[in-house]
C-alpha cells in the first residue's frame, strides 16, 4: 500500500510545484527574455490550459491501457518541458514549454486520483485524499522559499532544472516502485451489475462534481483576491501579506490532517455540511467587516474559515465523486479536474470583465456555492447501491 501512496503523492505534487516555484524568478525571466512581467504572467494561464486540455484524454487512456504508462509519460514530459523552459531564449518558446509542462502535470494529477480509487475503499480514500490536500497546501509556502534559496546562488534556469529533476524522480518512482492497479479491473467489472450504471449522467456524480467545482472556485477566488483585500483594504505590506498567506496555509494543513481523525467520529455527509457551514460563516464575517460592524482585521477570521472549510470538505467530496466508478475511474477523475479548472478560470475572468470588487467576488461564490452545495447534499444523498461498485481490483 505504501508504494501507491508514495507515488500518488509525488504525482499530485508536480501540479502545484509547476505553478509556485518559478514565480520568484519572474523578474529575471522577463528581463532575460525581453518581455514584461505582465506578459509572462500569462504563463500561469498557459500552464493551466495545458492541464485542462490533457485531462480528458489522459483519464480515458488510463482506463484503456492502464495507469502506469500515463504516469511515466506525464512525468517524463514534465521533466523534458522543464528542461526546455530553462533553455528558452524567447518568451514564445518559454510559453510553449510551460504549456507542455501543464500537459505532463495534468496527466500525473488525473491518474493519481484514479490510482487511489483503484487501491482504497471509500472510507480510507476519503482520509488519504484529505491528507493529499494537506500536503498540497504546503507547496505554495515551501516552493517559493526553495526557489529563493536556489536563486541566491544560481540564475533562474536552475528553477526549471530543479523541476526537471523532480519530474525524473517521479518518473523513476513510477517505473521502479509503482505497480499497475488497473490491469485486472475489467475482469471484476464484468461480474458487477453496477458497472452498467457507471454513467456520468447520474445525479450523484453530477452533484459531487458541482460541489467540488464550487469549492475549488471558492479557494482559487480567495487566492486571486487576497492581495487586494490584505494589502489594499487591510493595509498590510508585502512581508505581512506573505506571513498571512503562510499562516492560512498552516490552517489548511491542520484542517486537512485533522479530517482523517474526524472521519472516525463523524459521517462524511456531516463533514461536508460542516465545511459548507464554514463558508457561510466566512461570508458573514466579510459582510460584517464591509458594513463596519467589526474591524477589517476580522477578515483574517474569514480567510481561516474559507481555508479550513475547503480543506475539510474537498477530499471527502472528491472521494464520494469517484466512488461509483471502477472501470471508468480515470475519465471520472478527468471530468472532475476539467470542471474545477475551467469553472474557476471562467468565474474569475467574468468577474474581472464585469469589474466586480474583490470582496464581492469572494462573497458571491461563498454564498451561492454554499447554498447550492448544501441543497445538493440534502437532495442527493449517497447511493446505497454504490456499495456494489466499491470493490477494488485484485491487482491492487
From Swiss-Prot:
The chain crosses the membrane at residues 5-25, 42-62, 69-89, 93-113, 132-152, 158-178, 210-230, 243-263, 271-291, 298-318, 334-354, 361-381. Residues 1-4, 63-68, 114-131, 179-209, 264-270, 319-333, 382-396 are cytoplasmic. One of its GO terms (biological process) is xenobiotic detoxification by transmembrane export across the plasma membrane. It comes from the Bacteria. Residues 26-41, 90-92, 153-157, 231-242, 292-297, 355-360 are periplasmic. The keyword ATP-binding does not apply. It is found in: Cell inner membrane. It is a multi-pass membrane protein. Keywords: Cell inner membrane, Cell membrane, Membrane, Transmembrane, Transmembrane helix, Transport. One of its GO terms (cellular component) is plasma membrane. One of its GO terms (molecular function) is transmembrane transporter activity. HAMAP family: MFS_MdtL. Belongs to the major facilitator superfamily. DHA1 family. MdtL (TC 2.A.1.2.22) subfamily. This is Multidrug resistance protein MdtL. It comes from Shewanella oneidensis (strain ATCC 700550 / JCM 31522 / CIP 106686 / LMG 19005 / NCIMB 14063 / MR-1). The gene is mdtL.
